[in-house]
Amino acid sequence: MQYSIQKFLNEGAYKLQHIGINNPKLEARILLQHAINKPYEYLLANPEKQLNQLEIEAVEKVLERRLKHEPIAYILGTKEFYSREFIVNKHVLIPRNDTEILIDVVLQYHSQHSLCHSSNGGNPDKKQLDSVVKPRNNIKSSNILELGTGSGCISISLLLELPNSQITATDISIDAIEVAKSNAIKHDVTDRLQIIHSNWFENIGKQKFDLIVSNPPYISINEKPEMAIETINYEPSIALFAEEDGLLSYKIIAENAKKFLKQNGKIILEIGYKQADQVSQIFLDHGYVIDNIHQDLQSHNRVIEISLIQLNRSYARRIGKSLSGIQQNLLDNELPKYLFSKEKLIGKNYNSCKIKSNYTKFNLEKSKESVSRGAERIKIREHLRTYKEDVANFSSSTSIFLEIGFGMGEHFINQAKMNPDKLFIGVEVYLNGVANVLKLAEEQNITNFLLFPNNLDFILHDLPNNSLDRIYILFPDPWIKNRQKKKRILNKERLTILQTKLKNKGSLIFTSDIENYFEEVVELIKQNGNFQITNEDNYSKPHDNYIITKIPPKSY
């Protein structure tokens, strides 16, 4: 039988299309390249080149495997992940593009964590922002645990992006561990990667980690009929499916992670796109705080970010009191009433406060019930109801200003000081900033504000419509990389929601020192059609009552 390159490409693509392969021409070309070990340019330059007998046999073999729906990654023996090639076989899950979001979230966390401890008080300048997208040699070392490493693509990608970090990776499959070890050698990270045969946390010992990451099994067995044939028939079930509607993995992690996390440790997990609420509830029930839920490029919920926050000496130094003094204030309910949610400051559970025997119960703000140490935690949504009552208690004539991401709080607290007749609401995920606002407010006797120490999306839908006179978004995270731009604080959907929260003739003030980001926001606002830009003639002109902070203003 005679086969030219072009003839195989045509016939191979036809056969692949007949069984429902989505990109038959592309896959036929990739299979041919692999079988005859030639680059794409060679195929283009020699379409009439006749294949020899050995090449024909190799081509027919790989095509037959693909026609049986074997994943092309297993046929090739490799899969690209985060711009790097990884060895894969039937013993490991094939890396997905969606999982790259988990890497992005970890890297962003590291960058922000490094910047918020910088010498300029936590406000990154342009030079620092540029460093976020460059090699991260300046970021402090972290000790990371990955549960269920499979091919090792997550751990190895993180090690290559974070050269000062160490990772312990576990897997229950010895065959998968061999693949991960091969990839560690391939990418030269064996000196910083410890791979352990372990069922979840069993063989880790007494180590504690700054960060726990995982892409655990999360598919319900009930979803199996809806899945692709190649996934069901070839990829390892142990890496795909979990009992209890796909939630068992998260329950195991929630129940055990506290023993292996350092103080203020973080958990970052991939989740099924329909599981955000259920997974959040599992971790809330175990005394964690949900920091953020990140979406993939299809706008599906894909990665959840979870904190284990407990009372610590860093926070004590911030507000100028001893650790025991803060505990006493919590017990006596003396922490300022304007703190919207105590959950972040109380810690992983009530026992972490080391309550003395004569303090068996204490009250949470706005709660008439005493909460015993063993009682279930008050959830974020319950705090939101309290928050809405607080806002409702203010006169309808009171102006309410919202600042999203107030950083270290210089602008926020100064605005509250200058406008004592107005209510200021602050949203900020980083406790250093929250603690600094409390310190400044205590020093200056400022009380006309409420704080929400969590992600904006947890409060946004609960804000009453037509309730805000002004919204400040000042120098938000620019998410510089192209693939990260979907994470920017302002997008079409969120801008529409914010517009409904503003009163008629209310104002939105946005500032940035990243020029292209600022231009994109201006275009977004124009497309919305419900805003009138009042300083279009001079964007560099400061807005009314502008307060200079530690970020040098370059554009407004």
Swiss-Prot record:
Molecular function terms, GO-annotated: nucleic acid binding; protein-(glutamine-N5) methyltransferase activity; protein-glutamine N-methyltransferase activity; tRNA (guanine(46)-N7)-methyltransferase activity
EC number: 2.1.1.297, 2.1.1.33
Pfam families (UniProt xref): Methyltransf_4, MTS, PrmC_N
Region described as tRNA MTase: spans on this chain: 313-556
Annotated binding of S-adenosyl-L-methionine, by residue: G148, T149, G150, S151, G152, D171, W200, N215, E403, E428, N455, D477
InterPro entries, alphabetized: DNA_methylase_N6_adenine_CS, HemK-like, N5-glutamine_MTase, PrmC_N, RF_methyltr_PrmC, RPE5, SAM-dependent_MTases_sf, Small_mtfrase_dom
Catalytic reaction list: L-glutaminyl-[peptide chain release factor] + S-adenosyl-L-methionine = N(5)-methyl-L-glutaminyl-[peptide chain release factor] + S-adenosyl-L-homocysteine + H(+); guanosine(46) in tRNA + S-adenosyl-L-methionine = N(7)-methylguanosine(46) in tRNA + S-adenosyl-L-homocysteine
Active site: D477
Top EC group: transferase
Region (RF MTase): 1-310
Binding site for substrate: N215, P216, P217, Y218, K481, D513
Family membership: In the C-terminal section; belongs to the class I-like SAM-binding methyltransferase superfamily. TrmB family. In the N-terminal section; belongs to the protein N5-glutamine methyltransferase family. PrmC subfamily.
NCBIfam families for the chain: hemK_fam (TIGR00536), PRK01544.1 (NF002421), RF_mod_PrmC (TIGR03534), RPE5 (TIGR03776), tRNA (guanosine(46)-N7)-methyltransferase TrmB (TIGR00091)
Purpose of the protein: Methylates the class 1 translation termination release factors RF1/PrfA and RF2/PrfB on the glutamine residue of the universally conserved GGQ motif.
Listed HAMAP family: RF_methyltr_PrmC, tRNA_methyltr_TrmB
The protein, known as: Bifunctional methyltransferase
Organism per entry: Rickettsia bellii (strain RML369-C)
